């Protein structure tokens, strides 16, 4: 009987499940938002007008009032300065210009890859033309081309034929490419590297 009392006593003392309380943060995601208009929380700022004239050090509320009178925004341009520097401007136009500049910078930042074109020294004419087209396409894209001729067994004895084929590839793509590394034997391969011509 004692075990029954202990068993039922244990269940009677079960606590009701605790409710999970989720605290909402009002500033969630605020860190990623730009510091403009009402989001500026500094006690004092250095304000600059839309035409570049200094308005002096003032409370952000006063600078915001000036910006609103001109239908413009107050934007923090230098948060680290003492006091932080804010400028009166059209924020939509400013953001568009920044995105445009970043896009142009990304376009100019093409990194040259090394593409490989493999063939045998006994390659047929059609297959050679395909490799030549690939080489020209890679060079036009601004990439380097590693032309590789693979040898099997005793074929390495014909290294002179392989070198002639690589030099023919260099001559056929000479309009847009130049030899960066002369043909050389590496293991069971002969390799030549072409790079786009500097304009």
UniProtKB/Swiss-Prot annotation:
Q: Which GO terms describe its biological process?
A: ribosome disassembly
**Cellular component GO terms held in the UniProt record:** cytosol
Spell out the subcellular localization from the entry. Answer: Cytoplasm
InterPro entries according to UniProt: T_IF-3_C_sf (IPR036788), T_IF-3_N_sf (IPR036787), Translation_initiation_fac3_CS (IPR019813), Translation_initiation_fac_3 (IPR001288), Translation_initiation_fac_3_C (IPR019815), Translation_initiation_fac_3_N (IPR019814)
Gene3D superfamilies registered for this protein in UniProt: Translation initiation factor 3 (IF-3), C-terminal domain (3.30.110.10), Translation initiation factor 3 (IF-3), N-terminal domain (3.10.20.80)
Q: Which UniProt keywords apply?
A: Cytoplasm, Initiation factor, Protein biosynthesis
One example of the protein's molecular function in GO is:
ribosome binding
Q: Does the keyword Cytoplasm apply?
A: yes
Recorded superkingdom: Bacteria
Q: What is its main location?
A: cytoplasm
> Which NCBIfam families does the entry link to?
infC
The record's family statement is: Belongs to the IF-3 family.
State the protein's purpose: IF-3 binds to the 30S ribosomal subunit and shifts the equilibrium between 70S ribosomes and their 50S and 30S subunits in favor of the free subunits, thus enhancing the availability of 30S subunits on which protein synthesis initiation begins.
Quaternary structure, per UniProt, is: Monomer.
State the protein's name: Translation initiation factor IF-3
What species was this sequence derived from?
Answer: Gloeobacter violaceus (strain ATCC 29082 / PCC 7421)
Designated gene of the protein: infC
């Amino acid at each position: 009987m004692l075990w029954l009392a202990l068993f039922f006593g244990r269940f009677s003392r079960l606590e009701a499940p605790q409710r999970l309380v989720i605290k909402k943060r009002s500033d969630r995601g605020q860190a990623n938002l730009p510091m403009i208009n009402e989001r500026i929380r500094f006690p004092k700022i250095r304000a600059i007008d839309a035409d570049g004239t200094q308005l002096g050090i003032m409370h952000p509320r006063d600078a915001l009032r000036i910006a609103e009178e001109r239908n413009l925004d107050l934007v923090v341009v230098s948060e680290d300065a003492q006091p932080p520097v804010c400028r009166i401007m059209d924020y939509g136009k400013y953001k568009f210009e920044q995105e445009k500049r970043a896009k142009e910078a990304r376009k100019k930042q093409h990194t040259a890859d090394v593409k490989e074109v493999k063939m045998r020294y006994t390659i047929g004419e059609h297959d050679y033309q395909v490799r030549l087209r690939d080489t020209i396409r890679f060079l036009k894209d601004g990439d380097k081309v590693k032309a590789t001729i693979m040898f099997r067994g005793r074929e390495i004895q014909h290294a002179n034929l392989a070198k002639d084929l690589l030099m023919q590839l260099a001559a056929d793509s000479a309009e847009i490419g130049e030899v960066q590394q002369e043909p050389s034997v590496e293991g069971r391969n002969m390799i030549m590297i072409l790079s786009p011509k500097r304009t």
